[in-house]
């Protein structure tokens, strides 16, 4: 799997000469990381299997006007029709950092209107705290995975 260190804000490698780029993965001190407790309630397999997780390719990503948090994604979900998903991750990513990436989405959620735009699904992210600072990492996978590939 490719390193995703270059997609987070503050890790801009686009303008660095190759010689200056650090090819070793960033070391993370996990002793300072806090994660939410696991759910104590179990979900049966039939309920879980109703969620349709798919690989999606980010064709375009723009900031939603008049919103500080929302990004609007135009996604290839393998159906031949663009899918729009809005996500409140602008504090963690700039739109241009995500274009061309392969992400994971739940595609069978009912449309939800946000800022007047229908969001048709949800992108999957990992969230944790380092000290008091919340961190979010959009789940991205190998670009060799085709749009529409189902996750089990």
Question: Could you say what each language-model-derived stretch is?
Answer:
Residues 1-152:
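Phosphate-backbone binding interfaces of nucleic-acid-interacting proteins
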């Amino acid at each position: 799997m490719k390193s995703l260190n270059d997609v987070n804000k503050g890790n801009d490698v686009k303008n660095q000469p190759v010689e200056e780029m650090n090819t070793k993965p960033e070391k993370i001190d996990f002793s300072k990381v806090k994660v939410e407790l696991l759910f104590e309630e179990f979900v049966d397999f039939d309920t879980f299997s109703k969620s349709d997780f798919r690989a999606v390719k980010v064709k375009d990503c723009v900031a939603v006007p008049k919103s500080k948090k929302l990004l609007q994604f135009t996604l290839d979900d393998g159906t031949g029709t663009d899918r729009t998903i809005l996500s409140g991750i602008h504090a963690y990513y700039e739109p241009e950092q995500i274009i061309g990436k392969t992400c994971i989405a739940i595609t069978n959620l009912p449309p939800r209107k946000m800022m007047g735009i229908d969001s048709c699904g949800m992108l999957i992210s990992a969230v944790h705290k380092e000290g008091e600072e919340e961190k979010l990492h959009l789940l991205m996978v190998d670009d060799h995975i085709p749009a529409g590939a189902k996750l089990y």
